């Protein structure tokens, strides 16, 4: 996600609400990577702080990090995971395999509900 993305600013609090109310106590872990585009690390810190997004792991991926990877011949996360838009939601299983990708918050909730019922 991108801390300057208007859509991300709408989606992340909704995602956090679903997570804290339904998924966290079910043992689901959530991990977010904020990718620097037009904003800064301070924009990211401010948004995470204002929205109190503390119940899950937040990581900041700077332009310098991305440049360093590319210059080292290592694809950036956007290339590795085909991230074209922000935010991009992926679901991984307990073995960290991607089981669903590019979901909305509602689709994520639906998939998790189906998975929970199948257990």
Label every model-predicted segment:
Residues 30, 58-59:
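Conserved beta-strand scaffold positions in the cores of enzyme catalytic domains, especially
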Residues 9-51, 66-76:
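Structural microenvironment flanking redox-active thiols in thiol-disulfide oxidoreductases
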Residues 3-6, 53, 63-116:
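Thiol/disulfide oxidoreductase modules built on the thioredoxin-like
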Residues 51-57:
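Structural recognition of alpha->loop->beta junctions
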Residues 1-3, 33-36, 61-63:
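Active-site-proximal beta-strand/loop segments in catalytic clefts of secreted hydrolases
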């Amino acid at each position: 996600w991108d801390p300057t993305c208007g859509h991300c600013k709408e989606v992340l609090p909704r995602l956090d609400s679903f997570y804290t109310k339904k998924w966290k106590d079910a043992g689901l872990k959530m991990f977010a990577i904020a990718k620097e585009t037009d904003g800064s690390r301070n924009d990211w810190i401010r948004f995470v702080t204002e929205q109190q997004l503390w119940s899950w792991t937040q990581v900041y991926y700077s332009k310098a990090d991305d440049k360093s990877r590319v210059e080292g011949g290592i694809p950036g996360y956007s290339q590795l995971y085909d991230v074209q838009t922000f935010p991009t939601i992926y679901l991984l299983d307990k073995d960290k395999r991607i089981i669903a990708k590019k979901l909305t918050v509602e689709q994520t909730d639906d998939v998790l509900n189906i998975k929970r019922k199948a257990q």
